[in-house]
């Protein structure tokens, strides 16, 4: 009996220690995940509203499957306004006041650049959805991941398509002076130069809406091709103001920002926007998985839109991959979530998401730059074109690259 009396307390103590350990790493229900989105100007409100809807659908779908660690999740969405200082403040609020255990979403590169240090310093994992700037992953921070393409990679698709267009010898690039626009414009200019094509870049501040002066300067250059790297409503306004001046998508070969994939907003704001080219992330709808088709149907039903935008797909997957990582970690501890993310294979609506480079393998081992740290390597990037006035974005003609091509581009002489 004496031995039994000693053993029982030890068993109880062990159980209590295990229980306390679990409690230390598990959040109280619901488990909160932050969601970054630009929901007011000067940010891309069109993009932010799409991302918000997608993240809320992710919350719904994850909870319908049992949530994480036995809890529902709650996606706490915050408005970054597309501004770096606001983004840093909102990241701080999500962590210190809202109690999130990880963060997804993010549209503007400036938001990613400004907010990542806040999250990393506090040990909160972030999976950025649509922030392209290479430096976001380039400084190899422990808690920062990305499923959007690298700016250098995405910009390469834009300039390579422009370079192969017939008769292109000169290009004008109109870009916003942000962490997205500046490096993207530089990559395009460098790439075009490698093909013997001259380019001139005009920069404008985020929030600019009157482009009359810039349009006249662009016209004076008489370029064969125009690349517009202005996000959100600014991109709409430039395109229509250029069209009004006789130098829009129906007057010259014209690349517009991907915010134009929200076709209802595009045609309302740019009625002369037919024949514009745009970059789109993700495979065409005809190649969607069953889960992507279901999401697209639900998204269209909720929003009244004709299709789901690439940045909405990215936002959905950013929440989904975080939720899976928390489950696989068996914990809401930041270090445990990072370990799970570095080993994850997530069947997302964009495809299989994984991160080949991190603490176990440096990008340099495969001859890659540091920007590939915690970077998903497989996002599909296509060039699409509106070829009928008023057509929905999900039927746009894919004109590049050859592997996804559904039709020939229409070039304006």
PLM region descriptions:
Residues 301-309, 323-395:
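Segments of small-molecule ligand-sensing domains
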Residues 31-56, 78-85, 107-108, 174-182, ...:
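Extracytoplasmic "Venus flytrap"
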Residues 89, 133-135, 142-245, 285-294:
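Extracellular/periplasmic Venus flytrap/periplasmic-binding protein
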Residues 1-32, 412-413:
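Short, low-complexity disordered leader/linker segments with a strong preference
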Residues 28-31, 52-75, 196:
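Signal peptide-proximal N-terminal region
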Residues 242-316, 327-328, 399-412:
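Extracellular/periplasmic periplasmic-binding protein-like sensory domains
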Residues 45-51, 65-138, 147, 203-212, ...:
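Beta-alpha junction/loop-to-helix N-cap segments that form part of ligand/metal-binding clefts
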Residues 35, 94-107, 127-129, 170-175, ...:
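Periplasmic-binding protein-like
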